[in-house]
Protein backbone atom coordinates (compact mmCIF):
# COMPACT_ATOMS: atom_id res chain seq x y z
CA UNK A 1 0.00 0.00 0.00
CA UNK A 2 2.88 2.33 0.82
CA UNK A 3 4.46 1.55 -2.54
CA UNK A 4 1.23 2.35 -4.38
CA UNK A 5 0.94 5.71 -2.60
CA UNK A 6 4.51 6.63 -3.57
CA UNK A 7 3.90 5.87 -7.22
CA UNK A 8 0.71 7.88 -7.15
CA UNK A 9 2.52 10.82 -5.63
CA UNK A 10 5.22 10.68 -8.31
CA UNK A 11 2.58 10.56 -11.00
CA UNK A 12 1.03 13.68 -9.54
CA UNK A 13 4.36 15.47 -9.72
CA UNK A 14 4.85 14.42 -13.33
CA UNK A 15 1.36 15.56 -14.27
CA UNK A 16 1.64 18.97 -12.65
CA UNK A 17 5.15 19.81 -13.78
CA UNK A 18 5.73 17.77 -16.86
CA UNK A 19 9.24 17.05 -15.49
CA UNK A 20 10.75 14.49 -13.15
CA UNK A 21 10.45 15.46 -9.49
CA UNK A 22 14.17 15.83 -8.92
CA UNK A 23 14.43 18.31 -11.85
CA UNK A 24 11.39 20.32 -10.78
CA UNK A 25 12.75 20.69 -7.25
CA UNK A 26 16.02 22.22 -8.58
CA UNK A 27 14.28 25.35 -9.97
CA UNK A 28 14.77 28.58 -7.98
CA UNK A 29 11.69 29.78 -6.15
CA UNK A 30 9.92 33.02 -7.05
CA UNK A 31 10.91 36.07 -5.01
CA UNK A 32 8.94 36.39 -1.79
CA UNK A 33 9.28 39.30 0.63
CA UNK A 34 7.92 39.15 4.15
CA UNK A 35 5.39 41.99 4.16
CA UNK A 36 5.86 44.28 7.17
CA UNK A 37 2.87 45.44 9.12
CA UNK A 38 1.56 48.84 8.02
CA UNK A 39 3.13 51.29 10.46
CA UNK A 40 1.35 53.86 12.57
CA UNK A 41 2.71 57.38 12.20
CA UNK A 42 1.16 58.67 15.42
CA UNK A 43 4.35 58.51 17.50
CA UNK A 44 6.31 60.41 14.85
CA UNK A 45 3.60 63.04 14.51
CA UNK A 46 3.33 63.53 18.27
CA UNK A 47 7.08 64.07 18.52
CA UNK A 48 7.63 66.43 15.58
CA UNK A 49 4.43 68.49 15.43
CA UNK A 50 5.54 71.10 18.01
CA UNK A 51 8.56 71.88 15.80
CA UNK A 52 6.47 72.54 12.67
CA UNK A 53 4.95 75.98 12.18
CA UNK A 54 2.87 77.99 9.76
CA UNK A 55 4.56 81.04 8.25
CA UNK A 56 2.47 84.11 7.44
CA UNK A 57 4.13 86.74 5.25
CA UNK A 58 3.09 90.35 4.81
CA UNK A 59 4.46 93.08 2.59
CA UNK A 60 4.13 96.81 2.98
CA UNK A 61 2.50 98.04 -0.19
CA UNK A 62 3.88 101.28 -1.49
CA UNK A 63 1.34 104.08 -1.67
CA UNK A 64 1.58 106.17 -4.83
CA UNK A 65 1.39 109.94 -4.77
CA UNK A 66 -2.04 109.72 -6.34
CA UNK A 67 -3.29 107.43 -3.55
CA UNK A 68 -1.71 109.42 -0.72
CA UNK A 69 -3.04 112.66 -2.21
CA UNK A 70 -6.59 111.42 -2.41
CA UNK A 71 -8.91 114.39 -2.40
CA UNK A 72 -12.60 115.06 -2.39
CA UNK A 73 -12.02 118.23 -4.42
CA UNK A 74 -13.47 117.11 -7.72
CA UNK A 75 -12.88 120.59 -9.14
CA UNK A 76 -16.12 120.28 -11.04
CA UNK A 77 -14.79 117.25 -13.03
CA UNK A 78 -17.78 115.75 -14.78
CA UNK A 79 -19.93 118.72 -13.86
CA UNK A 80 -18.43 121.38 -16.15
CA UNK A 81 -21.74 121.98 -17.86
CA UNK A 82 -23.71 122.56 -14.68
CA UNK A 83 -24.94 126.12 -14.03
CA UNK A 84 -23.02 128.08 -11.40
CA UNK A 85 -26.00 128.13 -9.07
CA UNK A 86 -26.60 124.35 -9.39
CA UNK A 87 -27.00 122.64 -5.95
CA UNK A 88 -24.22 120.10 -6.74
CA UNK A 89 -21.71 122.90 -7.35
CA UNK A 90 -22.63 124.48 -4.02
CA UNK A 91 -22.32 121.04 -2.34
CA UNK A 92 -18.77 120.39 -3.54
CA UNK A 93 -17.63 123.94 -2.70
CA UNK A 94 -18.82 123.49 0.90
CA UNK A 95 -18.12 119.78 1.48
CA UNK A 96 -14.79 119.10 -0.24
CA UNK A 97 -12.55 121.41 1.85
CA UNK A 98 -13.64 119.75 5.10
CA UNK A 99 -13.00 116.25 3.75
CA UNK A 100 -9.60 117.25 2.38
CA UNK A 101 -8.60 118.48 5.83
CA UNK A 102 -9.55 115.09 7.26
CA UNK A 103 -7.55 113.26 4.57
CA UNK A 104 -4.49 115.40 5.40
CA UNK A 105 -4.77 114.49 9.07
CA UNK A 106 -4.87 110.77 8.24
CA UNK A 107 -1.80 111.14 6.01
CA UNK A 108 0.06 112.74 8.91
CA UNK A 109 -0.82 109.80 11.13
CA UNK A 110 0.26 107.24 8.50
CA UNK A 111 3.75 108.71 8.23
CA UNK A 112 5.88 109.47 5.17
CA UNK A 113 4.39 108.94 1.78
CA UNK A 114 5.26 105.66 0.07
CA UNK A 115 4.78 103.56 3.23
CA UNK A 116 1.47 101.77 2.87
CA UNK A 117 -0.14 99.32 5.24
CA UNK A 118 0.98 95.70 5.57
CA UNK A 119 -0.90 93.39 3.25
CA UNK A 120 -0.95 89.55 3.25
CA UNK A 121 1.52 88.32 0.66
CA UNK A 122 2.05 84.59 1.19
CA UNK A 123 1.49 81.70 3.54
CA UNK A 124 3.57 78.58 3.91
CA UNK A 125 5.17 76.24 6.39
CA UNK A 126 8.46 75.90 8.23
CA UNK A 127 10.20 74.07 11.08
CA UNK A 128 12.56 74.85 13.93
CA UNK A 129 16.11 73.49 13.71
CA UNK A 130 17.46 74.99 16.97
CA UNK A 131 15.98 75.49 20.40
CA UNK A 132 16.80 79.22 20.26
CA UNK A 133 14.41 79.90 17.39
CA UNK A 134 16.09 79.41 14.00
CA UNK A 135 13.64 77.95 11.51
CA UNK A 136 13.74 76.88 7.86
CA UNK A 137 11.25 77.60 5.08
CA UNK A 138 11.26 78.23 1.32
CA UNK A 139 12.69 81.34 -0.29
CA UNK A 140 9.62 81.68 -2.50
CA UNK A 141 7.45 81.89 0.63
CA UNK A 142 9.33 84.86 2.15
CA UNK A 143 11.04 86.53 -0.81
CA UNK A 144 8.55 89.40 -1.23
CA UNK A 145 7.82 89.89 2.46
CA UNK A 146 8.71 92.62 4.92
CA UNK A 147 7.01 91.19 8.04
CA UNK A 148 6.87 87.55 9.14
CA UNK A 149 4.68 85.79 11.68
CA UNK A 150 5.23 82.25 12.92
CA UNK A 151 2.16 80.36 14.14
CA UNK A 152 2.88 77.47 16.48
CA UNK A 153 0.83 74.28 16.52
CA UNK A 154 -0.92 75.51 19.68
CA UNK A 155 -2.00 78.71 17.92
CA UNK A 156 0.63 81.00 19.49
CA UNK A 157 1.74 83.76 17.09
CA UNK A 158 5.32 85.06 17.22
CA UNK A 159 7.11 87.67 15.15
CA UNK A 160 10.13 86.51 13.16
CA UNK A 161 12.91 88.21 11.25
CA UNK A 162 14.60 87.15 8.03
CA UNK A 163 18.16 85.87 8.58
CA UNK A 164 19.00 84.98 4.99
CA UNK A 165 17.64 83.45 1.80
CA UNK A 166 19.00 81.61 -1.21
CA UNK A 167 17.04 81.71 -4.46
CA UNK A 168 19.17 79.06 -6.17
CA UNK A 169 18.05 76.33 -3.76
CA UNK A 170 14.78 78.03 -2.72
CA UNK A 171 15.71 78.02 0.97
CA UNK A 172 15.39 80.68 3.66
CA UNK A 173 16.05 80.98 7.39
CA UNK A 174 13.92 82.96 9.85
CA UNK A 175 14.66 83.71 13.53
CA UNK A 176 12.20 84.04 16.38
CA UNK A 177 13.58 85.98 19.35
CA UNK A 178 11.90 84.59 22.43
CA UNK A 179 13.01 83.38 25.86
CA UNK A 180 11.33 80.01 25.50
CA UNK A 181 13.15 76.91 24.28
CA UNK A 182 11.58 75.62 21.09
CA UNK A 183 11.08 72.00 20.15
CA UNK A 184 13.29 71.42 17.12
CA UNK A 185 14.14 68.68 14.63
CA UNK A 186 17.35 67.61 12.91
CA UNK A 187 18.29 66.72 9.35
CA UNK A 188 18.61 63.07 8.35
CA UNK A 189 21.50 61.44 6.55
CA UNK A 190 19.71 61.32 3.22
CA UNK A 191 22.33 58.97 1.75
CA UNK A 192 20.46 56.30 3.70
CA UNK A 193 17.11 57.27 2.21
CA UNK A 194 15.85 54.65 -0.21
CA UNK A 195 13.12 54.67 -2.80
CA UNK A 196 10.14 53.00 -1.16
CA UNK A 197 10.82 54.30 2.36
CA UNK A 198 7.84 55.63 4.31
CA UNK A 199 7.76 59.39 4.88
CA UNK A 200 5.45 61.81 6.68
CA UNK A 201 4.81 65.38 5.44
CA UNK A 202 3.64 68.00 7.94
CA UNK A 203 2.54 71.48 6.90
CA UNK A 204 -0.15 74.10 6.47
CA UNK A 205 -1.97 73.38 3.19
CA UNK A 206 -4.33 76.12 2.06
CA UNK A 207 -3.92 77.82 5.43
CA UNK A 208 -5.92 75.11 7.19
CA UNK A 209 -3.33 74.66 9.93
CA UNK A 210 -1.22 71.67 10.94
CA UNK A 211 -1.93 68.80 8.55
CA UNK A 212 -0.21 65.41 8.33
CA UNK A 213 0.01 63.22 5.22
CA UNK A 214 2.01 60.07 4.55
CA UNK A 215 3.53 58.34 1.55
CA UNK A 216 6.78 56.94 0.24
CA UNK A 217 9.91 58.16 -1.49
CA UNK A 218 9.01 57.69 -5.16
CA UNK A 219 12.35 58.66 -6.70
CA UNK A 220 15.65 60.40 -6.01
CA UNK A 221 17.72 62.89 -7.99
CA UNK A 222 14.82 64.48 -9.86
CA UNK A 223 15.59 67.44 -12.13
CA UNK A 224 12.48 69.61 -12.51
CA UNK A 225 14.18 72.39 -14.46
CA UNK A 226 14.19 74.93 -11.65
CA UNK A 227 17.95 75.44 -11.69
CA UNK A 228 21.39 73.88 -12.12
CA UNK A 229 21.36 72.40 -8.61
CA UNK A 230 18.17 70.37 -8.97
CA UNK A 231 18.46 67.13 -7.01
CA UNK A 232 14.98 66.65 -5.59
CA UNK A 233 13.39 63.78 -3.73
CA UNK A 234 10.05 62.83 -5.27
CA UNK A 235 7.39 61.82 -2.75
CA UNK A 236 3.78 60.74 -3.13
CA UNK A 237 2.54 62.10 0.21
CA UNK A 238 -0.22 64.64 -0.42
CA UNK A 239 1.41 68.08 -0.69
CA UNK A 240 -0.57 71.18 -1.63
CA UNK A 241 -0.27 74.95 -1.70
CA UNK A 242 0.76 76.11 1.74
CA UNK A 243 2.95 73.06 2.36
CA UNK A 244 5.91 74.94 0.86
CA UNK A 245 8.77 75.09 3.32
CA UNK A 246 7.36 72.30 5.46
CA UNK A 247 9.34 69.18 6.36
CA UNK A 248 9.11 65.60 5.18
CA UNK A 249 10.16 63.20 7.94
CA UNK A 250 11.39 59.64 8.06
CA UNK A 251 9.94 57.34 10.69
CA UNK A 252 12.72 58.35 13.10
CA UNK A 253 11.41 61.92 13.09
CA UNK A 254 14.36 63.29 11.09
CA UNK A 255 13.91 65.71 8.20
CA UNK A 256 14.74 63.98 4.91
CA UNK A 257 13.47 66.81 2.71
CA UNK A 258 11.83 70.23 2.53
CA UNK A 259 8.64 70.39 0.46
CA UNK A 260 9.10 72.84 -2.38
CA UNK A 261 7.09 72.04 -5.49
CA UNK A 262 4.35 69.85 -6.87
CA UNK A 263 3.60 68.57 -10.34
CA UNK A 264 -0.05 69.23 -11.04
CA UNK A 265 -2.00 70.14 -14.17
CA UNK A 266 -4.85 71.37 -11.95
CA UNK A 267 -2.91 72.96 -9.08
CA UNK A 268 -4.02 70.28 -6.63
CA UNK A 269 -2.26 67.20 -5.31
CA UNK A 270 -1.80 64.34 -7.79
CA UNK A 271 0.77 62.41 -5.76
CA UNK A 272 3.89 63.97 -7.27
CA UNK A 273 5.70 66.32 -4.92
CA UNK A 274 9.32 67.40 -4.75
CA UNK A 275 11.44 68.02 -1.67
CA UNK A 276 14.92 69.51 -1.27
CA UNK A 277 17.16 66.75 0.14
CA UNK A 278 18.44 67.15 3.69
CA UNK A 279 22.08 67.09 2.56
CA UNK A 280 21.56 70.12 0.31
CA UNK A 281 19.47 71.97 2.87
CA UNK A 282 21.88 71.44 5.76
CA UNK A 283 24.86 73.07 4.01
CA UNK A 284 22.81 76.02 2.74
CA UNK A 285 21.08 76.58 6.09
CA UNK A 286 24.41 76.50 7.95
CA UNK A 287 25.79 79.18 5.59
CA UNK A 288 22.69 81.36 5.93
CA UNK A 289 22.83 81.25 9.73
CA UNK A 290 26.55 81.97 9.79
CA UNK A 291 26.86 84.57 7.01
CA UNK A 292 23.34 85.47 5.90
CA UNK A 293 24.24 84.37 2.38
CA UNK A 294 25.67 81.40 0.49
CA UNK A 295 29.08 81.50 -1.22
CA UNK A 296 29.45 78.97 -4.01
CA UNK A 297 32.37 77.79 -6.05
CA UNK A 298 32.50 78.87 -9.68
CA UNK A 299 34.22 77.42 -12.73
CA UNK A 300 32.68 79.76 -15.29
CA UNK A 301 32.07 77.46 -18.25
CA UNK A 302 28.90 76.79 -20.21
CA UNK A 303 28.38 73.03 -20.46
CA UNK A 304 26.08 70.49 -22.06
CA UNK A 305 25.50 66.73 -21.73
CA UNK A 306 27.68 64.17 -23.47
CA UNK A 307 25.33 62.04 -25.54
CA UNK A 308 26.25 58.65 -26.94
CA UNK A 309 26.76 60.22 -30.39
CA UNK A 310 28.95 62.98 -28.97
CA UNK A 311 31.01 60.46 -27.01
CA UNK A 312 31.54 58.42 -30.15
CA UNK A 313 32.56 61.48 -32.16
CA UNK A 314 35.16 62.38 -29.53
CA UNK A 315 36.50 58.86 -29.03
CA UNK A 316 35.15 58.56 -25.49
CA UNK A 317 34.30 55.05 -24.35
CA UNK A 318 31.32 56.19 -22.24
CA UNK A 319 28.74 58.97 -22.50
CA UNK A 320 29.68 60.59 -19.19
CA UNK A 321 31.06 63.99 -18.23
CA UNK A 322 30.23 67.56 -19.20
CA UNK A 323 31.04 69.02 -22.61
CA UNK A 324 32.39 72.58 -22.49
CA UNK A 325 30.53 74.78 -24.96
CA UNK A 326 32.00 78.14 -24.02
CA UNK A 327 34.30 79.32 -21.20
CA UNK A 328 33.27 82.73 -19.89
CA UNK A 329 35.81 85.49 -20.37
CA UNK A 330 37.92 86.02 -17.26
CA UNK A 331 36.50 82.97 -15.49
CA UNK A 332 38.65 80.46 -13.57
CA UNK A 333 38.04 77.90 -16.30
CA UNK A 334 39.17 80.22 -19.08
CA UNK A 335 42.26 81.31 -17.11
CA UNK A 336 43.21 77.65 -16.62
CA UNK A 337 43.06 77.03 -20.37
CA UNK A 338 39.80 75.11 -20.60
CA UNK A 339 38.54 75.33 -24.20
CA UNK A 340 35.45 74.77 -26.30
CA UNK A 341 35.05 71.06 -26.97
CA UNK A 342 36.83 69.88 -23.84
CA UNK A 343 34.98 67.29 -21.81
CA UNK A 344 35.27 67.51 -18.03
CA UNK A 345 35.50 63.85 -17.02
CA UNK A 346 36.57 64.16 -13.38
CA UNK A 347 36.80 66.70 -10.57
CA UNK A 348 39.39 66.14 -7.85
CA UNK A 349 39.79 62.57 -9.03
CA UNK A 350 36.10 61.68 -8.84
CA UNK A 351 34.31 60.92 -12.14
CA UNK A 352 31.76 63.47 -13.37
CA UNK A 353 28.44 61.92 -14.38
CA UNK A 354 26.84 64.83 -16.23
CA UNK A 355 26.61 68.67 -16.26
CA UNK A 356 24.27 68.75 -13.28
CA UNK A 357 26.70 66.65 -11.24
CA UNK A 358 29.58 68.98 -12.15
CA UNK A 359 27.57 72.13 -11.34
CA UNK A 360 26.58 70.83 -7.89
CA UNK A 361 30.07 69.67 -6.99
CA UNK A 362 31.78 72.87 -8.12
CA UNK A 363 29.23 74.92 -6.19
CA UNK A 364 30.06 72.94 -3.06
CA UNK A 365 33.78 73.80 -3.28
CA UNK A 366 35.16 76.61 -1.15
CA UNK A 367 35.98 79.72 -3.22
CA UNK A 368 39.75 80.18 -3.32
CA UNK A 369 40.46 76.46 -3.00
CA UNK A 370 42.43 74.56 -5.65
CA UNK A 371 40.71 71.94 -7.77
CA UNK A 372 42.05 69.31 -10.14
CA UNK A 373 40.01 69.11 -13.33
CA UNK A 374 40.46 66.16 -15.68
CA UNK A 375 39.67 66.88 -19.33
CA UNK A 376 39.25 64.80 -22.47
CA UNK A 377 40.87 66.79 -25.26
CA UNK A 378 41.92 65.76 -28.77
CA UNK A 379 41.54 62.08 -28.01
CA UNK A 380 43.50 61.97 -24.76
CA UNK A 381 43.15 62.81 -21.09
CA UNK A 382 44.71 65.94 -19.59
CA UNK A 383 44.65 67.46 -16.11
CA UNK A 384 44.63 71.13 -15.14
CA UNK A 385 44.75 72.69 -11.69
CA UNK A 386 42.84 75.88 -11.07
CA UNK A 387 41.65 78.15 -8.29
CA UNK A 388 37.92 77.98 -7.72
CA UNK A 389 36.23 81.37 -8.03
CA UNK A 390 33.19 82.78 -6.23
CA UNK A 391 29.91 82.48 -8.10
CA UNK A 392 28.71 86.04 -8.79
CA UNK A 393 25.28 86.81 -7.41
CA UNK A 394 24.13 87.84 -10.88
CA UNK A 395 25.94 85.08 -12.76
CA UNK A 396 24.29 84.44 -16.12
CA UNK A 397 24.85 82.16 -19.03
CA UNK A 398 27.23 83.53 -21.68
CA UNK A 399 25.61 85.92 -24.12
CA UNK A 400 24.18 84.25 -27.21
CA UNK A 401 26.10 84.41 -30.41
CA UNK A 402 25.08 87.29 -32.67
CA UNK A 403 25.84 88.55 -36.13
CA UNK A 404 24.90 85.45 -38.09
CA UNK A 405 24.21 86.04 -41.77
CA UNK A 406 20.65 85.22 -42.75
CA UNK A 407 20.97 83.59 -46.18
CA UNK A 408 18.46 83.90 -48.99
CA UNK A 409 17.53 81.04 -51.23
CA UNK A 410 20.12 80.57 -53.99
CA UNK A 411 22.69 82.84 -52.30
CA UNK A 412 25.96 83.02 -54.21
CA UNK A 413 28.78 80.95 -52.73
CA UNK A 414 26.60 78.12 -51.43
CA UNK A 415 28.38 74.77 -51.27
CA UNK A 416 26.72 71.43 -50.73
CA UNK A 417 27.60 68.96 -47.99
CA UNK A 418 25.29 66.37 -49.47
CA UNK A 419 26.14 63.51 -47.10
CA UNK A 420 25.19 65.75 -44.17
CA UNK A 421 22.05 67.16 -45.76
CA UNK A 422 23.43 70.72 -45.63
CA UNK A 423 24.41 73.56 -47.88
CA UNK A 424 26.68 76.21 -46.38
CA UNK A 425 28.15 79.57 -47.29
CA UNK A 426 31.11 81.44 -45.80
CA UNK A 427 30.06 83.67 -42.90
CA UNK A 428 30.22 87.42 -43.35
CA UNK A 429 32.43 87.82 -40.28
CA UNK A 430 34.87 85.15 -41.47
CA UNK A 431 34.11 82.91 -38.51
CA UNK A 432 32.76 79.52 -39.52
CA UNK A 433 30.24 78.74 -42.23
CA UNK A 434 26.58 79.69 -42.21
CA UNK A 435 23.96 77.03 -42.92
CA UNK A 436 22.05 78.04 -46.03
CA UNK A 437 19.64 75.10 -46.14
CA UNK A 438 18.89 71.88 -44.29
CA UNK A 439 17.34 68.71 -45.71
CA UNK A 440 14.50 68.03 -43.23
CA UNK A 441 14.89 64.26 -43.79
CA UNK A 442 18.62 64.28 -43.02
CA UNK A 443 20.46 63.57 -39.77
CA UNK A 444 21.20 67.29 -39.53
CA UNK A 445 17.49 68.04 -39.73
CA UNK A 446 16.67 65.39 -37.15
CA UNK A 447 19.17 66.92 -34.73
CA UNK A 448 17.70 70.39 -35.00
CA UNK A 449 20.15 72.25 -37.24
CA UNK A 450 18.52 75.28 -38.86
CA UNK A 451 19.09 77.78 -41.63
CA UNK A 452 21.04 80.80 -40.43
CA UNK A 453 22.91 78.93 -37.73
CA UNK A 454 26.67 78.85 -37.93
CA UNK A 455 29.09 75.90 -37.91
CA UNK A 456 32.12 77.24 -36.04
CA UNK A 457 34.19 74.08 -35.73
CA UNK A 458 34.18 70.39 -36.53
CA UNK A 459 35.94 68.03 -34.12
CA UNK A 460 37.29 71.14 -32.36
CA UNK A 461 38.98 72.41 -35.53
CA UNK A 462 37.92 75.79 -36.88
CA UNK A 463 36.29 75.80 -40.30
CA UNK A 464 35.76 78.66 -42.76
CA UNK A 465 34.51 76.82 -45.83
CA UNK A 466 32.81 73.64 -46.94
CA UNK A 467 36.23 72.28 -47.93
CA UNK A 468 37.42 72.76 -44.35
CA UNK A 469 34.41 70.80 -43.10
CA UNK A 470 35.02 67.96 -45.58
CA UNK A 471 38.72 67.82 -44.72
CA UNK A 472 38.02 67.33 -41.02
CA UNK A 473 35.34 64.74 -41.77
CA UNK A 474 37.68 62.76 -44.05
CA UNK A 475 40.35 62.74 -41.35
CA UNK A 476 37.77 61.45 -38.87
CA UNK A 477 36.86 58.66 -41.29
CA UNK A 478 40.53 57.68 -41.58
CA UNK A 479 40.64 57.44 -37.79
CA UNK A 480 37.68 55.06 -37.88
CA UNK A 481 35.16 57.52 -36.43
CA UNK A 482 31.51 57.19 -37.39
CA UNK A 483 30.47 60.57 -35.90
CA UNK A 484 31.81 64.12 -36.14
CA UNK A 485 31.27 66.84 -33.54
CA UNK A 486 29.91 70.15 -34.86
CA UNK A 487 29.99 73.33 -32.79
CA UNK A 488 26.90 75.36 -33.66
CA UNK A 489 26.28 79.02 -32.88
CA UNK A 490 22.77 80.45 -32.92
CA UNK A 491 20.89 83.33 -31.40
CA UNK A 492 20.01 81.10 -28.43
CA UNK A 493 23.70 80.42 -27.71
CA UNK A 494 26.34 77.87 -28.57
CA UNK A 495 25.97 74.07 -28.54
CA UNK A 496 27.60 70.89 -29.85
CA UNK A 497 25.88 68.38 -32.14
CA UNK A 498 27.25 64.99 -33.23
CA UNK A 499 26.39 63.99 -36.81
CA UNK A 500 26.94 60.58 -38.45
CA UNK A 501 29.53 60.55 -41.24
CA UNK A 502 29.32 58.06 -44.08
CA UNK A 503 32.31 55.76 -44.44
CA UNK A 504 33.69 55.26 -47.91
Swiss-Prot record:
<dbReference type="InterPro" id="IPR001940">
    <property type="entry name" value="Peptidase_S1C"/>
</dbReference>
<dbReference type="InterPro" id="IPR001478">
    <property type="entry name" value="PDZ"/>
</dbReference>
<comment type="function">
    <text>Might be efficient in the degradation of transiently denatured and unfolded proteins which accumulate in the periplasm following stress conditions.</text>
</comment>
<dbReference type="GO" id="GO:0030288">
    <property type="term" value="C:outer membrane-bounded periplasmic space"/>
</dbReference>
<feature type="region of interest" description="Disordered">
    <location>
        <begin position="102"/>
        <end position="122"/>
    </location>
</feature>
<dbReference type="GO" id="GO:0006508">
    <property type="term" value="P:proteolysis"/>
</dbReference>
<keyword id="KW-0346">Stress response</keyword>
<feature type="compositionally biased region" description="Basic and acidic residues">
    <location>
        <begin position="102"/>
        <end position="118"/>
    </location>
</feature>
<feature type="active site" description="Charge relay system">
    <location>
        <position position="244"/>
    </location>
</feature>
<dbReference type="Pfam" id="PF13365">
    <property type="entry name" value="Trypsin_2"/>
</dbReference>
<dbReference type="Pfam" id="PF13180">
    <property type="entry name" value="PDZ_2"/>
</dbReference>
<feature type="domain" description="PDZ 1">
    <location>
        <begin position="287"/>
        <end position="378"/>
    </location>
</feature>
<feature type="region of interest" description="Serine protease">
    <location>
        <begin position="113"/>
        <end position="286"/>
    </location>
</feature>
<feature type="binding site">
    <location>
        <begin position="299"/>
        <end position="303"/>
    </location>
    <ligand>
        <name>substrate</name>
    </ligand>
</feature>
<feature type="binding site">
    <location>
        <begin position="242"/>
        <end position="244"/>
    </location>
    <ligand>
        <name>substrate</name>
    </ligand>
</feature>
<dbReference type="GO" id="GO:0004252">
    <property type="term" value="F:serine-type endopeptidase activity"/>
</dbReference>
<keyword id="KW-0574">Periplasm</keyword>
<keyword id="KW-0677">Repeat</keyword>
<keyword id="KW-0645">Protease</keyword>
<feature type="domain" description="PDZ 2">
    <location>
        <begin position="401"/>
        <end position="491"/>
    </location>
</feature>
<feature type="region of interest" description="Disordered">
    <location>
        <begin position="428"/>
        <end position="447"/>
    </location>
</feature>
<keyword id="KW-0378">Hydrolase</keyword>
<dbReference type="InterPro" id="IPR009003">
    <property type="entry name" value="Peptidase_S1_PA"/>
</dbReference>
<keyword id="KW-0732">Signal</keyword>
<dbReference type="InterPro" id="IPR036034">
    <property type="entry name" value="PDZ_sf"/>
</dbReference>
<feature type="signal peptide">
    <location>
        <begin position="1"/>
        <end position="26"/>
    </location>
</feature>
<protein>
    <recommendedName>
        <fullName>Probable periplasmic serine endoprotease DegP-like</fullName>
        <ecNumber>3.4.21.107</ecNumber>
    </recommendedName>
</protein>
<dbReference type="InterPro" id="IPR011782">
    <property type="entry name" value="Pept_S1C_Do"/>
</dbReference>
<feature type="active site" description="Charge relay system">
    <location>
        <position position="140"/>
    </location>
</feature>
<keyword id="KW-0720">Serine protease</keyword>
<feature type="region of interest" description="Disordered">
    <location>
        <begin position="389"/>
        <end position="411"/>
    </location>
</feature>
<feature type="active site" description="Charge relay system">
    <location>
        <position position="170"/>
    </location>
</feature>
<comment type="similarity">
    <text>Belongs to the peptidase S1C family.</text>
</comment>
Amino acid sequence: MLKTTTVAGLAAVLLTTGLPAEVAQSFAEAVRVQAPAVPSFANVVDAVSPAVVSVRVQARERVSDDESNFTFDFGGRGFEDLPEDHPLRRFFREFAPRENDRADRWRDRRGPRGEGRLRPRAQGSGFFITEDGYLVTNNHVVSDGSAFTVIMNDGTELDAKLVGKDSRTDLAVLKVDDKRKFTYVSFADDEKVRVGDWVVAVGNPFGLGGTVTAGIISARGRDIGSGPYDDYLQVDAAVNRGNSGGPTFNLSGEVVGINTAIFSPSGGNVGIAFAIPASVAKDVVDSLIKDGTVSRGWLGVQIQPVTKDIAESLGLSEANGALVVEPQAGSPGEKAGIKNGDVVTALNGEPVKDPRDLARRVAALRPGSTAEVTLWRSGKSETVNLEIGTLPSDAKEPAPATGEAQPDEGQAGEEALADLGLTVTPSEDGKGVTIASVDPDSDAGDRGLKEGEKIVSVNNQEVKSADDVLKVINNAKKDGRSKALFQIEAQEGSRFVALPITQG
